[in-house]
């Protein structure tokens, strides 16, 4: 199709959408047969620019959800607390986003109808479509193992130690049996991966542990539906067991959309962990996510107190403010955290 347009004399901009799963899988198969340098034969090299399409982030959701509130949101910067009326309104919008996630059809349905049942139905349909794609394109990767990994996200994140454990997939499961399935899901952008760093040391890429990581879902709303968490629990119960992982998934989703680079986490052992770590230039930014039961904050606070990093962030439901050695940033500002440093 692209070649037909490019071979003519008509000059126009063409926008095409797709998962590229067929291209990726086809390329992988040719690479095995023709060597690692094999390219998809039908790909119009040099004629297209690729853009990654993500679920709507919170700012995009807010723009559709409440245009007037979004206009105020766009003006927020610095570390001064927000007026309480705006803080409460933005928390309400954040709660709605945690329920819907950022899949456009789901967001549109919620804004038009505000029907939790319809939201859940649409999300289950999307989950089923993703699983159908896995069966369709899984091929030599073993679709069954890909599905096992994808369906394990909720129990994996529900563990006290959220690190991905192969043995939790099924009895006797080994890394070499499922590594390819995980790489397929990451490449297809169905899951998000955060690697552990063994030291808080620049550059983080040099201390990244390739065999220690957490897997999160593409979209927080789909993860919530997979976990069968009703909207009422999100609003009325601030401390149910899965609230923490759900909020972490939300924060990771927003951070990855900021373009600030790879998001990692730090863990010396299960009880000594910093939720996320960003490298901004040469600065290491420790991040605490306070979403549910507070299990790991001691490590974050100790690091901030002893190392005195230039930037340190705690995301929570509290208002924007400087709090000792770190900045408390409301969860609804995660997508624009850099404006608050």
Question: What spans do the regions from the language model cover?
Answer:
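Conserved catalytic cores of phosphodiester-cleaving nucleases, focusing on short active-site segments
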Residues: 14, 255, 274-293, 312
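Accessory nucleic acid-recognition modules appended to NTPase machines
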Residues: 103, 107-274, 278
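Conserved Walker B catalytic segment
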Residues: 1-15
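Interdomain motor-coupling "hinge/lid" segment immediately C-terminal to the ATP-binding subdomain
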Residues: 10-12, 18-20, 24-158
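Catalytic cores of nucleic-acid endonucleases
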Residues: 291-329
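Active-site regions of enzymes building and remodeling cell-envelope glycoconjugates
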Residues: 50, 323-338
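Hydrophobic/aromatic beta-strand patches that form the interior of the parallel beta-sheet core
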Residues: 15, 49-51, 216, 264, ...
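Short beta->alpha connector loops
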Residues: 19-22, 34, 197, 268-270, ...
């Amino acid at each position: 199709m692209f070649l037909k347009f490019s071979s003519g004399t008509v000059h126009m901009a063409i926008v095409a959408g797709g998962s590229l799963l067929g291209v990726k899988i086809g390329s992988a198969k040719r690479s095995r047969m023709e060597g690692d340098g094999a390219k998809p034969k039908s790909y119009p090299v040099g004629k297209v620019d690729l853009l990654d399409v993500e679920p709507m982030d919170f700012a995009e959701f807010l723009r559709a959800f409440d245009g007037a509130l979004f206009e105020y949101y766009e003006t927020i910067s610095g570390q001064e607390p927000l007026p309480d009326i705006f803080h409460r309104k933005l928390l309400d919008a954040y709660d709605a986003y945690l329920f819907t996630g950022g899949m456009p059809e789901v967001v549109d349905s919620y804004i038009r109808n505000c029907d939790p049942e319809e939201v859940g139905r649409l999300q289950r349909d999307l989950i089923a479509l993703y699983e159908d794609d896995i069966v369709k394109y899984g091929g030599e990767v073993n679709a069954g193992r890909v599905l096992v990994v994808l369906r394990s996200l909720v129990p994996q994140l529900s563990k006290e130690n959220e690190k991905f454990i192969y043995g939790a997939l099924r009895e006797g499961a080994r890394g070499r049996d499922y590594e390819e399935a995980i790489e397929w899901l990451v490449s297809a952008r169905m899951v998000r991966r955060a690697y552990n760093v063994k030291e808080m040391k620049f550059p983080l890429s040099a201390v990244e542990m390739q065999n220690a990581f957490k897997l999160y879902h593409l979209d927080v709303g789909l993860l919530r539906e997979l976990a069968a968490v009703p909207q009422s629990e999100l609003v009325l119960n601030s401390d149910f067991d899965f609230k923490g992982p759900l909020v972490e998934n939300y924060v990771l989703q927003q951070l990855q959309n900021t373009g600030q680079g790879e998001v990692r986490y730090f863990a010396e052992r299960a009880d000594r962990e910093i939720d996320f770590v960003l490298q901004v230039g040469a600065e290491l930014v420790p991040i605490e996510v306070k979403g549910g039961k507070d299990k790991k904050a001691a490590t974050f606070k100790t690091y901030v107190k002893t190392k005195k990093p230039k930037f340190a962030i705690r995301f929570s439901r509290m208002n924007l403010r400087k709090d000792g050695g770190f900045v408390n940033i409301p969860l609804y500002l995660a997508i624009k955290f850099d404006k608050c440093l």
